[in-house]
């Protein structure tokens, strides 16, 4: 049986507030579940969605992927874990044509001995400037 102390949820100070009623991270025993994370900043702007010369936002999969994984690392560190504790990654891409660029950045953080991974194409994410969202499961014994 999981005790109350082993089943905690947390919103992380300095990170964008979730766009719904859920925590950034939830502990269940020795496992940590990080909710779907994007490149959204606390001020509701997005890394990797800066405007081009015409003023239109141009989503950049590499910048967004790097920021998403950095946000996940910060969330994990807030509960005493790190990216090395991640055992499963599920990534959601709006455009599978971005897969190679996403994969390149992903490899900056994880190698072939890293977590199990699934990458899924989705029709859209909660904001039109977002092109990637990632959720992870980490194993960090109490």
Swiss-Prot record:
It comes from the Bacteria. Transmembrane segments: none annotated. Belongs to the 2-aminomuconate deaminase family. GO terms for cellular component: cytosol. Keywords: Aromatic hydrocarbons catabolism, Hydrolase. Gene3D superfamilies: RutC-like (3.30.1330.40). Homotetramer. It is an enzyme of class 3 (hydrolase). The gene is amnD. GO terms for molecular function: 2-aminomuconate deaminase activity. Slightly inhibited by Pb(2+), Hg(+) and Cu(2+). CDD domains: YjgF_YER057c_UK114_family (cd00448). It comes from Pseudomonas sp. SUPFAM superfamilies: YjgF-like. This is 2-aminomuconate deaminase. Pfam families: Ribonuc_L-PSP. Its EC number is 3.5.99.5. One of its GO terms (biological process) is catabolic process. Stable up to 55 degrees Celsius. Optimum pH is 7.0. Stable in the range of pH 5.5-8.0. It catalyses: (2Z,4E)-2-aminomuconate + H2O = (3E)-2-oxohex-3-enedioate + NH4(+). Involved in the modified meta-cleavage pathway for the 2-aminophenol catabolism. Only active toward 2-aminomuconic acid. The keyword Hydrolase applies. InterPro entries: RutC-like_sf, YjgF/YER057c/UK114.
